[in-house]
Amino acid sequence: MVTIRLQRGGAKKRPFYQVVVSDSRCARDGRFIERVGFFNPVASGSAETLNLDLARIEHWVATGAAVSDRVAKLIKDATKAA
């Protein structure tokens, strides 16, 4: 099953998440199919907190990809801000 979920990066105590499309059997930070955005929860100043390619996300959902709970909230925030 294909899933749209967060992939953790960044440094210790400074998380940075890539929003990726991956096979649900792959590890959290493992192989992925496509990167569709990022989420920076500790952005400061004028740094961008959230950037999603909503067109690609809609494409993957239309093909049957499941969306994780946190990514669903991020998509809702991104559509409200756009």
From Swiss-Prot:
Keywords: Ribonucleoprotein, Ribosomal protein
UniProt xrefs under Gene3D superfamilies: 3.30.1320.10
Family matches, as InterPro entries: Ribosomal_bS16, Ribosomal_bS16_dom_sf
Domain of life: Bacteria
GO biological process assignments: translation
GO CC aspect terms: cytoplasm; small ribosomal subunit
GO molecular function terms noted in the UniProt entry: structural constituent of ribosome
Ligase keyword on record: no
HAMAP family: Ribosomal_bS16 (MF_00385)
Family the entry assigns: Belongs to the bacterial ribosomal protein bS16 family.
Protein name in the entry: Small ribosomal subunit protein bS16
Organism: Aeromonas salmonicida (strain A449)
Gene name linked to the record: rpsP
